Regions:
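Transmembrane beta-strands of outer-membrane beta-barrel pores
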Residues: 191-195, 242-248
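Short loop/turn motifs that connect adjacent beta-strands in outer-membrane beta-barrel proteins
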Residues: 39-45, 122-134, 175-185, 224-236
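Alpha-helical transmembrane segments that form the membrane-embedded catalytic/substrate-binding core
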Residues: 106-113, 150-177
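Small-polar-interrupted transmembrane alpha-helices in polytopic inner-membrane proteins
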Residues: 56-57, 131-151, 167-170
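Residues on the lipid-exposed face of transmembrane beta-strands in outer-membrane beta-barrel proteins
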Residues: 171-175, 217-223, 271-275
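Residues that define the transmembrane beta-barrel architecture of outer-membrane proteins
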Residues: 211-217, 263-271
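Transmembrane beta-strands of outer-membrane beta-barrel proteins
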Residues: 138, 142, 185-187, 234-240, ...
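N-terminal targeting leaders of membrane proteins
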Residues: 13-103, 107-114, 118, 122-126, ...
Length: 276
């Protein structure tokens, strides 16, 4: 009888001990897969994103500094030539440079930069809204820094219009997250080298992003994204493109031949399906 009582007591004791031990040991949270966004802020990921961003920004600055800002410096000035804040919105040569197609280029480039920042921040555990907002702010800051550097360049100048275009592009992903209509709209870029006019002039094989004569920017619309319940194929969109032709002469004001054809050139428009 004592043996039976002892066995029952042991089973009860082990059961109680196991229950108490399970209650005191916290559950181990499954590790988030590397390529999956963290649910909460992951300090290690956040630090890695910051370190990678700083390295990328430094590398980009080093490249652009040699490509764009290697000339002798001037005092700070706006694109219109003046240095007073009241002259910030004066139209300079920037107003006719590349038939203003570069404004779309600033928008598109900033949108890509902002999206990269936002994806990294989201991966580290921030919410979607926080990530897109921070992406917009950081993208705008990068655009502002570029324009400030341009403000000291003898070739360029701080362009308020370039900065505004870049800022809109930086916040476009955030605006898309808030608008059903904007989710169906996107900006895309294509490059096809159909002539060498630009490269024949600059005498080097670089800076293709400034070769607007061979560049096309597309505004795409996908009806399925606007109304998922529609029968419109989700892989098919409609695109309207814009570019400039090879008559776009004298990219820079100091080009041989003077300024008589500065700002000339014709637009090219395209209509095409957008197959995703």
């Amino acid at each position: 009888m004592r043996f039976i009582f002892w066995m029952v007591s042991m089973v009860f004791s082990v059961s109680v001990f196991a229950t108490n031990e399970a209650d005191t040991i916290p559950a181990i949270k499954p590790k988030t897969p590397f390529f999956k966004n963290a649910d909460t802020l992951n300090v290690k990921r956040f630090a890695a994103v910051n370190a990678t961003s700083l390295l990328a920004l430094y590398g980009s600055y080093h490249y652009i500094n040699n490509a764009w800002w290697a000339d002798s410096k001037k005092t700070f000035h706006f694109d219109g030539g003046g240095s007073r804040i009241t002259q910030a919105f004066d139209f300079g040569r920037d107003a006719i440079y590349a038939k203003s197609l570069d404004k779309i280029g600033h928008f598109y480039g900033a949108r890509i930069t902002s999206d990269i920042f936002a994806r990294g921040i989201r991966w580290s555990g921030k919410t979607e809204a926080q990530s897109l907002l921070w992406g917009g702010l950081l993208g705008t800051a990068v655009q502002g820094f570029i324009e400030i550097k341009d403000g000291y360049s003898p070739t360029w100048g701080f362009s308020v219009y370039d900065w505004m275009s870049g800022s809109l592009g930086s916040f476009y992903p955030y605006f898309q997250s808030k608008s059903k209509f904007l989710k169906a709209l996107d900006i895309k870029y294509s490059y096809y080298r159909k002539d060498n006019y630009y490269y024949d002039f600059i005498k080097r094989e670089s800076n293709f992003q400034d070769d607007y004569m061979n560049s096309t920017f597309w505004l795409t619309y996908n009806p399925h994204r606007f109304k998922p319940s529609s029968k419109w194929p989700k892989w098919l969109g409609i695109s309207v493109g814009i570019g400039v032709d090879h008559t776009l002469n004298n990219y820079y004001i100091n080009m041989p031949g003077g300024t008589s054809d500065w700002g000339k050139g014709g637009y090219e428009f395209y209509l095409a399906p957008d197959i995703d």
